[in-house]
Amino acid sequence: MKQYLDLEKYVLENGTQKGDRTGTGTISTFGYQMRFDLQEGFPIMTTKRVPFKLVVSELLWFLHGDTNIRYLLQHNNNIWNEWAFERFVKSDDYKGEDMTDFGLRAERDSAFKEVYQAEMEKFKARILEDEAFANKYGELGNIYGKQWREWKTSQGETIDQLADLIEMIKTNPNSRRLIVSAWNPKDIPNMALPPCHSLFQFYVADGKLSCQLYQRSADIFLGVPFNIASYALLTHLIAREVGLEVGEFIHTMGDAHLYNNHIEQVKEQLSRTPHKLPKLVLSDKPATIFDFDVADISLDGYNPDPAIKAPISV
């Protein structure tokens, strides 16, 4: 997609070198927006393969209100493993090798990388096999799904923001309050990772549903391709439920950054030519957005260039 390649190029040419929480370092810019017409095809990278089923299972995980990686692992989805693993290795229950700064060390030390990978595999297996262990160490805190579906009020009540949003689109589509927020200051200290994609708003006009996302922190090479596909999918799912066509997905970013250890991968991607976008295919079976399974969602005509691997910064 040209919009995304333009973002990569813009940050390479105009970004500022900054330090960051992970110790990796970034090239960063503040304030950037992309627009995607969802009528023109499903917006997923074609200049590198994005594992769409991982996008699907993560979004369904959010929609279920789940915050434990066990569901993700049951669907062969490893994208949140590092944050749960980090919590475990910092606990008194962990008795293995020292895992301090495991992400950076694994990137720089091949011998340590083997040790880290072995510990991670043991951790994943235990999450899947031991429910009590999973309940304790698979939990990521009150991240996205919890805030979307069970926002706790000061009176001890809960708000299902997503269900309320869908009902409001049906009954008052002209509302300017079609908003869901994952940014809950009270819960931030206990989250494994505070929400990067922190607030989204819907807009109805001419029989079409559009979505705008505000993302406070945007990992351009690894995270943003998932975010684009995820919120485009969410827009399609909600549009189906409320009887509207899809309009635009508008992606607004705060700190949009390229990690310093992703620069060569970005240059490789920029050398590739975008292909035709695929079409999203949704099963007619699910009654509501909350009834979808991974098998109900697929892409037709997705023929991307090969994946480009890059390390994740934790």
Swiss-Prot record:
Its EC number is 2.1.1.45. It comes from the Bacteria. (6R)-5,10-methylene-5,6,7,8-tetrahydrofolate binds at residues 219, 313. The active site is at 196 (nucleophile). One of its GO terms (cellular component) is cytosol. Disulfide bonds: none annotated. Catalyzes the reductive methylation of 2'-deoxyuridine-5'-monophosphate (dUMP) to 2'-deoxythymidine-5'-monophosphate (dTMP) while utilizing 5,10-methylenetetrahydrofolate (mTHF) as the methyl donor and reductant in the reaction, yielding dihydrofolate (DHF) as a by-product. This enzymatic reaction provides an intracellular de novo source of dTMP, an essential precursor for DNA biosynthesis. Belongs to the thymidylate synthase family. Bacterial-type ThyA subfamily. This is Thymidylate synthase. GO terms for molecular function: thymidylate synthase activity. It comes from Listeria monocytogenes serotype 4b (strain CLIP80459). It catalyses: dUMP + (6R)-5,10-methylene-5,6,7,8-tetrahydrofolate = 7,8-dihydrofolate + dTMP. It holds the Pfam family Thymidylat_synt. Homodimer. InterPro entries: Thymidate_synth/dCMP_Mease, Thymidate_synth/dCMP_Mease_dom, Thymidate_synth/dCMP_Mease_sf, Thymidylate_synthase, Thymidylate_synthase_AS. It is found in: Cytoplasm.
